[in-house]
Amino acid sequence: CEASRGLGDVYKRQIPELVKAAKENGVAVLAIINSHHMAAMWPETEKIAEEGLVAFACTSYKPAVAPAGAIKPLFGTNPISFAWPRKNNTPVVYDMATASMAMGEVQVAKREGHKVPLGTGLTKDGKDTTDPAEIADGGVLLPFGGYKGSGIAMMVELLAGALVGDNFSYETAAKDNNDGGPPSGGEFILAIFPDKLSDKDWDK
């Protein structure tokens, strides 16, 4: 789905088609490219799970996170969301950034004047800091869980960038003028119909 640099939320209107395709085929994927911003992903994975499907979504954006052991940004905060359907109950829904903290939370901490945990990010000189301003203003976030989080962030780059035909996070930096406009990113949304892949008792 081509977003033409619009907000990703608009193009999530394709979700009903994704649900239909997954129920017909067992598995379906929706790829959104050239989106300005995806917003939170849990509402869409929850909506898919409410239709009786397992859902996974991930998105990449502009570089803000250094790989484990590095000091320069390469990955986006690269959030992931997962939802599991439950018959006669609300879905189990999970949503998180693969960074140690979402950049929005760092910005809130900066605005409110409180510190962030050690390990959240580095200064522009690559030094550990608990000052959110030093992270937000030229510094860099770190992945959660060190090399493990770094590996998951790389997975998101491959699924929401290379696989769908969009840019890697680091490639968007050249288009970023920091005014809230470009760059753009991609999103990968997977839907699985468990009734086709398992017996009917998968929800025991």
Predicted regions located by residue number:
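Catalytic-core signal marking the mid-to-C-terminal active-site face
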Residues: 163, 169-204
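Secondary-shell segments that build the walls of catalytic and ion/ligand-binding clefts
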Residues: 111-170, 175
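Phosphate/diphosphate-binding glycine-rich loops and adjacent basic-rich segments that engage nucleotide
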Residues: 65-133
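Short beta-strand segments
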Residues: 33, 56-59, 83-85, 94-97, ...
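Short coil/turn connectors at secondary-structure junctions
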Residues: 24-28, 50-54, 76-79, 87-91, ...
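A glycine-rich phosphate/pyrophosphate-binding beta-strand-loop-alpha-helix module
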Residues: 16, 20-60
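Single conserved hydrophobic/aromatic residue that forms the stacking wall/gate
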Residues: 1-7, 11
